[in-house]
Amino acid sequence: RALDDLVTQGKIRYIGCSTHPAWAVMESIMVSESKNYVRLSTEQPPYNLLDRRIENELVPLAQRYKIGLITWGPLAMGVLAGRYKTPNEYPKGSRAARRGGFYADRISKKGIAIGQEFTKLAKKIGISAAQLALLWCKDQPGITAPLIGTRTIKHLDILLPVLEMTLDDDTRKACDVLVPPGSFVADFHNTSYWNRARVLE
């Protein structure tokens, strides 16, 4: 009710949530409709080629109920940009190196192997791996927009041209071969108690 009041009073425009499972988003929609409250406009889940689990339930739910999906982690913390070579050696300045914990837990042997193949695919089509990672996420069905967390203007300049790019069918299929739809090789939901999983190496 508090969020409904904030919207109706003009203090905020929209309501969103982050890293919620499909059932929790659906529960929120049902409560809003039964009580005539303003309902969720967006959900902000982790989503990248290495962790595609939201495609199983959350994406179809969002499409049906017109919920925007503003996803985070499109570059998989740099794994899809080819920054990692081994699971136990983190690039200087990376979140895995600086903070460890659940950030480091997202780095998997399988994820790194996929990242290296992904880098080759990007080179083959003539763009950077970071650009391809963002492009793949941007052009997936049901995704409203991916969030980017660049720390430098240089990185931003690399990614901005992706706005004008379109993912072709052949590249999409090649990505599906690397990590099939709905599956995962790295756990980016590892801060969510309802969706933690272990990646078997």
Question: Language-model segments: which ranges?
Answer:
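Short acidic/polar active-site loop segments enriched in Thr and Asp
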Residues: 13, 38-41, 68, 128, ...
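Short catalytic/ligand-gating loop segments at beta-alpha or beta-beta junctions
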Residues: 126-134
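Aromatic-lined glycan-binding groove of carbohydrate-active enzymes
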Residues: 54-94, 128
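Terminal-tail/helix-coil boundary detector
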Residues: 64, 88, 92-120, 124, ...
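Active-site-adjacent beta-strand anchor residues
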Residues: 18-19, 73, 127, 146-149
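Glycine-rich beta-alpha junction loops
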Residues: 21, 47-51, 73-80, 136, ...
